[in-house]
């Protein structure tokens, strides 16, 4: 089916977007195909429909902090840098999700063995990602979320040393 398509025309659903030059937010989410619609619904609920750019890499926040695929982190940082100039972004949203294959592959399986342990692993990595972004881009706000495959989304708040 794909091989025989030379030109494809899709309907332009939002003609008014052609004139926009700014997006307030960069969403960094996982590549997982199971949550594409839910991710769009979240951004709409946050009032950010038509006001965000998106980068998708395996593991979302894990892409920034993992030690095996460090080029993913560089990609995120380079993207933030250019989008500050191109679209004047003001905030970053990391959207991790439960039952993530990248997490299963890149961190110890026992850290994901219960819902509580999985939440703790995501919280730790989301907070590491937040810290990296705040150090390199102190002018940007950083928000972190964890989505379940059931569509339930929890905001993960910044941890301070006293909280540990």
Swiss-Prot record:
Domain of life: Bacteria
Protein name: Uncharacterized protein RBE_0009
Family annotation (Pfam families): Pro_CA_2
GO terms, molecular function: carbonate dehydratase activity; zinc ion binding
């Amino acid at each position: 089916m794909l091989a025989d398509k030379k030109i494809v025309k899709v309907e332009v659903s939002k003609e008014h977007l052609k004139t926009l030059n700014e997006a307030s937010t960069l969403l960094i989410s996982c590549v997982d195909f199971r949550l594409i619609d839910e991710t769009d619904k979240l951004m709409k609920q946050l009032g950010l429909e038509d006001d965000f750019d998106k980068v998708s890499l395996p593991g979302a926040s894990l892409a920034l902090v993992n030690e095996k695929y460090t080029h993913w982190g560089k990609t995120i940082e380079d993207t933030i840098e250019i989008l500050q100039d191109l679209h004047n972004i003001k905030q970053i949203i990391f959207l991790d999700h439960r039952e993530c294959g990248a997490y299963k592959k890149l961190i110890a399986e026992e850290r994901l063995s219960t819902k509580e342990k999985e939440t703790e692993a995501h919280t730790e990595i989301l907070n590491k990602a937040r810290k990296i972004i705040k150090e390199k881009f102190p002018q940007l706000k950083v928000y972190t979320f964890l989505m379940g495959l059931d569509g339930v989304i929890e905001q993960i708040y910044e941890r301070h040393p006293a909280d540990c």
